[in-house]
């Protein structure tokens, strides 16, 4: 099945903390990890893992995170030839705090995600027509 996913792509910067900080509070002893994220990216990866032939349409910055994400998508078997590189904005980033009780706070810096436009979508009309 040919699937086209159009959506966001982020690098998630995650800090696991004992509790979410109050305004002005610093919480120490955080455990940090970095992950691949974005609503569109998560859908593309899930569809590829289920056996779909997935083309992912997103916008990334011209930075090290873009290279990491494209490599990740390729390893997942996702077609990346429709990914747009935005030289004006960085790759999207999500800053996530997760408390021990699983509550979280998320701040998203959309970066290049905001540069994906209807003009880009019109340029891939053939890809969309060929999808199931």
Spans of model-derived segments:
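Conserved N-terminal subdomain of the carbohydrate kinase-like
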Residues: 26, 49-131
């Amino acid at each position: 099945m040919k699937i086209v996913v159009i959506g966001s792509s982020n690098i998630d910067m995650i800090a696991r903390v004992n509790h979410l900080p109050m305004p002005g509070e610093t919480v120490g002893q955080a455990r940090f990890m970095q992950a691949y994220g974005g609503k569109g990216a998560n859908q593309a990866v899930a569809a590829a893992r289920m056996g779909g032939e997935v083309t992912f349409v997103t916008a990334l910055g011209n930075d090290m995170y873009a290279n990491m994400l494209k490599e990740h998508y390729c390893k997942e078997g996702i077609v990346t030839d429709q990914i747009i590189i935005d030289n004006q904005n960085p790759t999207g980033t999500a800053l996530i705090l997760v408390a021990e009780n699983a509550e979280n706070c998320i701040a998203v810096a959309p970066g290049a995600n905001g540069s994906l436009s209807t003009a880009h979508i019109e340029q891939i009309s053939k890809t969309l027509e060929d999808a199931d």
